[in-house]
């Protein structure tokens, strides 16, 4: 089994490509379920944001995994493979593990240290758990990714003076206008990005805020938080005639503001310039708006320069975060190595349970007068003896599994306890990694042999 990441991000693909390969939040569950049915894919999680769309997968073979995931993306987005392939990035095995941890910590973001991506990774993780598209390996990997991401923000100041794409949009507006105190800001979209834009604008002493959203109640809720005005979407053209700055992030599939709409609104502006920032993927604002006199349009890729100016301190802090990531990688790989020992431990327990069962049957034949209570008591104590006797061998097996030549050492371990045949049967049962630990824990519960050490 191998861990594989396939996708595009802001470094590998321009926005024109990223917006073609972007999953809407309500598509993720269906997409993960469909990908689960692809050949070679054992587990999968999809993370899709404005700056990246990445498929994380456990595959049985790397080359077939790459092929079927690429095929899935091509078919889902109706894009020929030859158009898609030049922009795809691939991470395999250790590099894939490191990449996920860097993403969760915000080190791979356009804005180093931003916190949004951790929430998006966690959200995709929860969706995958709910849809059962992941199993043993990704449950542990993504749990550790979320943990190291949270540790990053708790133990460093990498998120201080918060910077995000929406914050960068505000910074760009300030550079162009100087002060925002007398400016009318129009926020199009009341989702997370719109909310962040409003929060970043709130401390700038802005003159007026108008929020427009497809759902008026959401627009009103956001506007009320910042003493602004809410309007419905059918009032957009009128609002464009009044605003000085537009920050747009609706998540719509088509352009929300067209060149024709802006031309009509522009007749009422009397030559006043309009600064527009499109932080949505796919884009909300027609790129042709840049052709209009007095309109200054920037999209998410244009914000990279603004973002860069705020990041030097975060880069220095990132060196400390790299140490967190290195430790997390070591911890996960140690855990991953122990997966191979699960069938061995199961076989050892099965053999011990068989001996205990045979012993109990022999006792009951020789002592037929035993009461039900006495039989239960004997069974409990014989299992207790087994647990105590197995403790050290199981700990040793786990230590062996973490060593470089673990395969040979575990083979010798199985020979010593004469459990090779049973371990082979246990391994056959657990070839689908999504069932390995679950089956092991289920067997423990059934037999009454308690876990001796935490998994």
UniProtKB/Swiss-Prot annotation:
It comes from the Bacteria. Substrate binds at residues 49-52, 109, 114-116, 120. PANTHER family: GLUTAMYL-TRNA REDUCTASE (PTHR43013:SF1). The keyword Transferase does not apply. One of its GO terms (molecular function) is NADP binding. Homodimer. Pathway: Porphyrin-containing compound metabolism; protoporphyrin-IX biosynthesis; 5-aminolevulinate from L-glutamyl-tRNA(Glu): step 1/2. GO terms for biological process: protoporphyrinogen IX biosynthetic process from glutamate. Its EC number is 1.2.1.70. It is an enzyme of class 1 (oxidoreductase). It catalyses: (S)-4-amino-5-oxopentanoate + tRNA(Glu) + NADP(+) = L-glutamyl-tRNA(Glu) + NADPH + H(+). The record marks 99 as: Important for activity. The active site is at 50 (nucleophile). The keyword Amino-acid biosynthesis does not apply. Possesses an unusual extended V-shaped dimeric structure with each monomer consisting of three distinct domains arranged along a curved 'spinal' alpha-helix. The N-terminal catalytic domain specifically recognizes the glutamate moiety of the substrate. The second domain is the NADPH-binding domain, and the third C-terminal domain is responsible for dimerization. Keywords: NADP, Oxidoreductase, Porphyrin biosynthesis. Belongs to the glutamyl-tRNA reductase family. This is Glutamyl-tRNA reductase. NADP(+) binds at residues 189-194. InterPro entries: 4pyrrol_synth_GluRdtase, 4pyrrol_synth_GluRdtase_dimer, 4pyrrol_synth_GluRdtase_N, GluRdtase_CS, GluRdtase_dimer_dom_sf, GluRdtase_N_sf, NAD(P)-bd_dom_sf, Shikm_DH/Glu-tRNA_Rdtase. The gene is hemA. It comes from Bacillus velezensis (strain DSM 23117 / BGSC 10A6 / LMG 26770 / FZB42). During catalysis, the active site Cys acts as a nucleophile attacking the alpha-carbonyl group of tRNA-bound glutamate with the formation of a thioester intermediate between enzyme and glutamate, and the concomitant release of tRNA(Glu). The thioester intermediate is finally reduced by direct hydride transfer from NADPH, to form the product GSA. Catalyzes the NADPH-dependent reduction of glutamyl-tRNA(Glu) to glutamate 1-semialdehyde (GSA).
